[in-house]
């Protein structure tokens, strides 16, 4: 019975790793047609954010300029003007299609991520016993490591997260999450998050060293500061 219980966290850990990917893929396939049909039938004229509205309006201004150009070249043959009007009509249809696809993409990804978060939260609550066992395994593994390896691991992790070159990684990660939720790229917001997250993590980490490591393992703190210097 203890052996059987000891092995139960392994499939649980594997399910936590692969479950989000499987849920995302399944929900994208199942919700895509429903959201597409819902969006096309409701015929909404509301833009999801100011950036999308600005982009679409800029495209319509370009089309309007083409219409003005059409008026200016009326002395050209009728066939040439007809081709120009057909081209503008096709561009307008393509613009509307791109606009709709952008809205559908935003709604689909946002709904999928919210659903995944809700399912994983419930899954974690139901698997509380497995989480306790995983936590004990992790604590035992870390306890068996030498102080030098622990200090090296902490130093490597902090350099990756809050080191000199970390803003580039944070920018890629935040942009990826931002895009995964279906939001349009926004440089001011991303730059603000990139400049804020490392500072917050650095403060939390220093507080953790001061409150926890100094009390639990003073030798580890000495080795860490020696390697960091």
Curated annotation (Swiss-Prot):
<dbReference type="InterPro" id="IPR004282">
    <property type="entry name" value="CemA"/>
</dbReference>
<keyword id="KW-0813">Transport</keyword>
<keyword id="KW-0812">Transmembrane</keyword>
<dbReference type="GO" id="GO:0009706">
    <property type="term" value="C:chloroplast inner membrane"/>
</dbReference>
<keyword id="KW-0630">Potassium</keyword>
<dbReference type="GO" id="GO:0015297">
    <property type="term" value="F:antiporter activity"/>
</dbReference>
<keyword id="KW-0472">Membrane</keyword>
<keyword id="KW-0934">Plastid</keyword>
<feature type="transmembrane region" description="Helical">
    <location>
        <begin position="114"/>
        <end position="134"/>
    </location>
</feature>
<dbReference type="GO" id="GO:0015078">
    <property type="term" value="F:proton transmembrane transporter activity"/>
</dbReference>
<keyword id="KW-1133">Transmembrane helix</keyword>
<comment type="similarity">
    <text>Belongs to the CemA family.</text>
</comment>
<feature type="transmembrane region" description="Helical">
    <location>
        <begin position="154"/>
        <end position="174"/>
    </location>
</feature>
<keyword id="KW-0633">Potassium transport</keyword>
<protein>
    <recommendedName>
        <fullName>Potassium/proton antiporter CemA</fullName>
    </recommendedName>
</protein>
<feature type="transmembrane region" description="Helical">
    <location>
        <begin position="189"/>
        <end position="209"/>
    </location>
</feature>
<dbReference type="Pfam" id="PF03040">
    <property type="entry name" value="CemA"/>
</dbReference>
<comment type="function">
    <text>Contributes to K(+)/H(+) antiport activity by supporting proton efflux to control proton extrusion and homeostasis in chloroplasts in a light-dependent manner to modulate photosynthesis. Prevents excessive induction of non-photochemical quenching (NPQ) under continuous-light conditions. Indirectly promotes efficient inorganic carbon uptake into chloroplasts.</text>
</comment>
<keyword id="KW-0406">Ion transport</keyword>
<keyword id="KW-1001">Plastid inner membrane</keyword>
<keyword id="KW-0050">Antiport</keyword>
<feature type="transmembrane region" description="Helical">
    <location>
        <begin position="7"/>
        <end position="27"/>
    </location>
</feature>
<dbReference type="GO" id="GO:0006813">
    <property type="term" value="P:potassium ion transport"/>
</dbReference>
<keyword id="KW-0150">Chloroplast</keyword>
<keyword id="KW-0375">Hydrogen ion transport</keyword>
């Amino acid at each position: 019975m203890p052996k059987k219980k000891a092995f139960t966290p392994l499939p649980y850990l594997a399910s936590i790793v692969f479950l989000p990917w499987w849920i995302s893929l399944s929900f994208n396939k199942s919700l895509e047609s429903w959201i597409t049909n819902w969006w096309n039938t409701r015929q909404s004229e509301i833009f999801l954010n100011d950036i999308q509205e600005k982009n679409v309006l800029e495209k319509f201004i370009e089309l309007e300029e083409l219409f003005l150009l059409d008026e200016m070249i009326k002395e050209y043959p009728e066939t040439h003007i007809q081709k120009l009007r057909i081209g503008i009509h096709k561009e307008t249809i393509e613009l509307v299609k791109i606009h709709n696809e952008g809205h559908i993409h935003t709604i689909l990804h946002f709904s999928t991520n919210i659903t995944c978060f809700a399912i994983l939260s419930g899954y974690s609550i139901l698997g509380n016993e497995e989480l306790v066992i995983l936590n004990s395994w992790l604590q035992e593994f870390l306890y068996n490591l030498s102080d030098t390896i622990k200090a090296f691991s902490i130093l490597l992790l902090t350099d990756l997260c809050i080191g000199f070159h970390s803003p580039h990684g944070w920018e890629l990660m935040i942009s990826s999450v931002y895009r995964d939720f279906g939001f349009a790229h926004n440089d001011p917001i991303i730059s603000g998050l990139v400049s804020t997250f490392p500072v917050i993590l650095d403060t939390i980490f220093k507080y953790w060293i001061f409150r926890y490591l100094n009390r639990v393992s003073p030798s580890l703190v000495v080795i860490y500061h020696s390697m960091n210097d």
